[in-house]
Structure formats: structure tokens, C-alpha cells
Amino acid sequence: MIRQLQDMTGVDPTKVPIKDDKVMTIFNGIEGLDIKNPDYKFTHGSYGIPEFGTKFVRQMLDDTKPEAFADLVRISGFSHGTDVWLGNAQELIVSGTATMKDAISTRDDIMNYLRLKGVPNKDAFTIMEKVRKGKGLTEEQEELMRENDVPEWYIESCKKIKYMFPRAHAVAYVMMSNRIAYYKVYYPVEFYAVYFTAKVAYFDEKVTLKGIDAIEARMEEIIRKGKDASKKEEDELPVLEVAYEMCSRGYEFAPARLGISDSMRFLSYEGKVLLPFVAISGVGEGAARTFAEEYSRRPYETVEDVSERGKVNKTALDEMRAHGVLDGLPETAQMSLF
């Protein structure tokens, strides 16, 4: 994803600043998105951002209200651990027992905190290793922690943890997410084009091309089904959410166009997100590639030419025709003499 964004924008991701106030706003609200839709229903700006776009992590963002890069690193630790967040850090933070900065998020937090409290380095390391592997604490370790004024809530939190993420991994993940968020804020069309390219299998062009009302209606239809929604619909919903956000920012989809669209990738074209041929219902990956490759060798002259050289079957041909891809092409090369 990041390489495609670099190719489309010309912006080197390694030059993207870690600290950008506008980018940070999408992790605690929607201000940085410049939403144009007055009836916009979402309260998060992190849809489509790796690590931060899922419903689970969006709830974390609500509970923690991150304000800085370091907060995002902690959230990454919470989300990748087992029994680190649910029934543990979440309850401590929401109840006010601990702040996000105090709660345990990555394995390094434990050793650093215990050393700060005065626990000997070797013991702090041993405790960290036991906790991160889900082995809890011995009575002796608990007593040592109490002797150094480690609060009871911290000791109990350690005993609940089954697995912990290393801080270095969390930092690497968040750096990537932060860079992608930068493109989302400052290069929105390119961001959405790259996102939908990755999710094309779950993209329904018959809904998205109709615009924001149709997208919202389809989202609500799937949500109403609840647990009765199919796996395909569950996979479709996050893609619809990102499409809804995109349209709410004032951007549009453009139907696939012969001679301009790519076979597989969504493109930025005239300020819109241009669909690839593979996004058309009934057009598979192989057909889309062959269709585009044959056109690049020699432009199609007729619909019959598309069928023969492009190896496009009748179903795909009908969908292309309905989509407008074949507009301007005569059906055959035969000419009437009378």
C-alpha cells in the first residue's frame, strides 16, 4: 500500500513527518478530513488505516483519546496483546484507576516501570518475561513489587496478561499507519484509489457509482441483518464505510473508461477515483488483464473485436456495455451498402 501511494503521489513516505497536528486529528475525531456532508454519521477518521480502522480499535480510540504518536504506540500494544486490553487496561482507563500512560501496553513497559519504582534490574526483567508469556507472578515477585510501592491494580493487571507485544514492533506498525494517514489527509484521492485496489474483491460498483445515498442505504441494510449477514456482506461493509467517508469528503467515483482505466488498479483521474476493469461485476482478473493488454497492443474497433481479441465472454461483455466502457464502439465492422 505504501509503495503504491509513493508512486501515485511522488511523496517519499520516509519524509512524512511523525508529528503532524492535522493527521493526528483523524485518530481522535474527523476534523482533519474536512467533511462536506452535513449529515455525516461517523465520528472516527481512521477508517481504512491499517491497525486503526477496525471496530475493535476504533473503540480503543474512543476510550483512550490519543493525543500524540506515543499514545498510538500504546494502543497498538493494547490491540496486539492477549488479555492486555479487554478486561484489563480498558477497565482501568475507563474507571480512572489508571491513565493510558500508566497502563501496561507493551512488554517493555513492565521492566521500565519496575526499574523506575526501584525493583532491581534482574528482577524487573524476570517479571517482564514471566508476564509477557502469560505465566503470571510468584508470591515472592508480588511481595517484591509491593515493597517498592507498586500499586495493587498494576500487580493484578500483570496477572491477567497472556501475551504481550514488543514495543519495537508497535512503533514500526504505528510509523507505517501514521504515514498512510498522512496520505489520507493530504492526498485523499490517491489514498482511496490505493485502498480500493487492495479491497477490490469486496467492492460493489453497482452501489458505489450511485453515490452517497446508495452507499449509506447498503451499509444500513447489512447492519440491520446483524449476525444474519453473510461473510461476503461482512467483508463488504468496511469497504462501504470507506466509500461513504470518501464521498462525504466531496470526492466521487468515476466509471471505468476504455483507454484510461487500468485492468486492476483504481486510479486518480480528474480529481475522481477511477474504477479498474476488474471492478466491473462479471469481469474476472484474467479477463480484465487480457482486455487491457489487447487494447494496449491495438485499440478495439468494434464490440465484436472486444469479444474476439479481448476474450471477453457474453456476461462480462453485457456488464461492460451497461457500465459504458464500450460506448462509441459499433457492434461489428460490417457496413451496409444500401
Language model region names:
Residues 1-338:
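Noncatalytic, beta-rich nucleic-acid-contacting surfaces in large DNA/RNA-processing enzymes
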